[in-house]
Amino acid sequence: MRRKLAGWFALVGVISAISYAGRFAGGKPPKNALYEYSTAVSELILFAIILALVFWIARGLPKREAFALRRPESWGRAIALGFAVLIAIAIANAALDPLLHGGREQGLTPSGWQSSHAAAFAVNLFAFAIVGPIAEELTFRGLGFYLLEPYGQTVAIAVIGITFGLWHGLVEALPVLIVFGTGLAFLRSRTRSIYPGMLLHATFNAAALLLAVTV
């Protein structure tokens, strides 16, 4: 199990290092990156590679347990916890964004809606709001949480929150991302399922992208 945890840390560390190297060397992506097919293609390829490595690390483990592929005992409780996590994230963002402007750092906010690029935007929405959350939840609140849980749920929640934040390679947005990752890990620990966090993550990303082109 320790070798698998070391492999997981190595994967997360490499992706984090690449993300920060790209952030400091190349800066933000083009302002209208969400209107380019190449953005979605590169993200989909990256997520495919990540998932392949995650499943390779998880080889030999019971997949249902390792990835928490089970329904929560109560969807009502899971939804209530999800709203609580969402409120915590909103409060953190409202408090920190005026100071750090983390919402602008990722550089995925288009200059406005461009109907001529609707198809490319739809593909990017699929990549960032569906495939991305699935891949990241399986990586962090799935395998990562499972491998860290023997050290205690508090440790697992904290480590998952911090590594999830670093994974994105951002500076100003790092505190909010850590809160987001910690909240999703808390949701995973309380529901014993990956699905509520996956739905919350996907909903959050989709709402952020749609608001970016409509507000």
Task: Identify the function of each model-found stretch.
Residues L53-K63, F186-T191:
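Structural signal for the C-terminal ends of transmembrane alpha-helices
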Residues I87-A88, W113, H117-V215:
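Transmembrane helix-loop-helix hairpins at the membrane interface
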Residues K4-L11, Y35-E43, F47, S74-G82, ...:
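Residue-level signature of transmembrane alpha-helical entry/exit and packing/kink sites
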Residues K4-G60:
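Alpha-helical transmembrane segments in multi-pass membrane proteins
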Residues V14-G22, L46-I50, V85-N93, H168, ...:
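Alpha-helical transmembrane segments of multipass membrane proteins
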Residues A25-G26, L96-P98, L187-R188:
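Juxtamembrane C-cap of transmembrane helices in multi-pass membrane transport proteins
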Residues K31-E36, K63-G132:
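Juxtamembrane helix-loop-helix connectors linking adjacent transmembrane helices
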